[in-house]
C-alpha cells in the first residue's frame, strides 16, 4: 500500500539503518522483490535496506512519470524554476542526513560527504536558473509571406541511472537538467547507496508535483527494465563501461542515451611546472574519495628534469594522508572503499605493476588496525611501465602510477593511449607547452595547472570509451530537449 508519510521525517541515529521504498506519485510503495541489505564498508554495520523493484513495479514508476509529463511540460519555465529552487532548499535542510547516509553507505569521510551534498544543492539551483533560459529562434524563409519558428521542447519521461561513488551529486546532475527542461524522471540509484535516495524522495514529496521525480531501487535487472521501457524517451547513465555497453544494447534504437563511463585519466608534468602545485594537485585528484571518481588521476607522466622531485613529493604527501572511518573521523583525508571488488582490483593492480618492475614508494596495502573495513593506504608506484594495468586500465582506487618522459609529444601520445577520454591534467608554466597540451590531449575535459576538470556551467562529457553526451552547463539542459520547426504562412493566400 502507498504511504504519504515521510519515512525519515527527523534525523536518525547513525546506527539505525535507512529503510527504502519505491517512490512514485509522491508516495512510497512496498515491493514484492527480495530486499537488498547495504552494509557500511568501514565496519560492516547495516546501513540501509532497499527493495529489488520488479519489472511491474518499475513500470508503475514510469507510468507515474508519463502521466505527470504533459502538465509539467506545460508549466511555465518560471514555475519550474521556482519549484526546483524549493527542492534545493528542502535538500539543504536535510544536508546532514544526506551526508551521513553517504558516509555510512559509500565510505567517504563525512566532511567530504557534506561537500558532495552542497554540490548537489548547487546543481539544483543552477538548473533552476537555466530553466528560464531555453530559447528558440525565428528563421527567415525564401518565400514571401512565410516565417519559420524553431522551438525546443522536452523529450518526455527520462531515466537517470546513477552510480555509488557520488550517489547524491550525480542524481542532481540528471534530476536538475531533466526537470528544468520540462522532462519528468525516474531515478534508479545504485544498490550500494540506496539510503541517500530515500532521503531525497522525502524532499521531493514536500516540494514537487506528483510524478515529476520518482525513485526505484534494485540491481542491474531493475536498471534494464527501466532503460528498456518504451515510455522512456532518454536514459542518462553514469557508471562502468561494462554496464554502459549493456545499456547500449538494451535501449530501443529510438531512445535517447547519454553515457559517462569514466576512464584512465592522465596527468602530464613538464620541467617548467610548479612542482609543489603539481604534487598537491596529483595528491588531491588521485586519492580524493579513495580514488573512486571517474576523473581520478590514474597515471602521471613527468619530464625527467623534475621526475625525482615530483615522485618524492607525491610519495611524502600520500603517506601523510589520514585514512580512517569517515564517521569517527569526519575530516579524514581518505575513507573506506565502497566495494570489495574495488578493494581487490586495487591490490591486483599494485601486484601487477610491481611484478613488471614498478617500485612502491608510498602505501602498498591495507591499513593496519582497521580490518575488516575496506581501507587501503594511498599508494604511489614509481617508474610504472607502460604495460602495467595501472597505466592503462581504470583502477578506481587509491593508486597512481608515475613514469618519466623526455619529449612532450611522446608524453601526449602516451597520455592519449588509453581507451577512455574523459579528463586529462597538465602542469606547465610555459605558454607554448600549455597550448600544445590543451590541444593535443584528446579528452572531453582538460585542466591545466589545476585538477578541477568539471564546473557546473560548462559541458562535461567524454570521448571514445568514456561515452558520449554532455552534462553540466546549457549543454546539459539541451540534452533533454528536442527541436520543433513550425512554418507559418502569414501573407495573403
Regions found by a protein language model. Name each.
Residues 37, 51, 73-74, 106, ...:
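A structural signal for short, well-ordered beta-strand elements
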Residues 26, 44, 80, 102, ...:
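Residue-level signal for inorganic ion chemistry
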Residues 69, 73, 88-95, 99, ...:
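Structural signal for hydrophobic packing residues in well-ordered secondary-structure cores
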Residues 43-49, 232, 268, 368, ...:
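Conserved C-terminal structural/oligomerization subdomain of aldehyde/semialdehyde dehydrogenase
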Residues 2-146, 338:
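N-terminal Rossmann-like NAD(P)+-binding subdomain of aldehyde/semialdehyde dehydrogenases
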Residues 136-277, 405:
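Rossmann-like NAD(P) dinucleotide-binding subdomain of oxidoreductase/dehydrogenase enzymes
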Residues 41, 55-58, 77, 95, ...:
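Residues at or immediately preceding the N-termini of alpha-helices
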Residues 242-385, 448:
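ALDH superfamily catalytic-core signature
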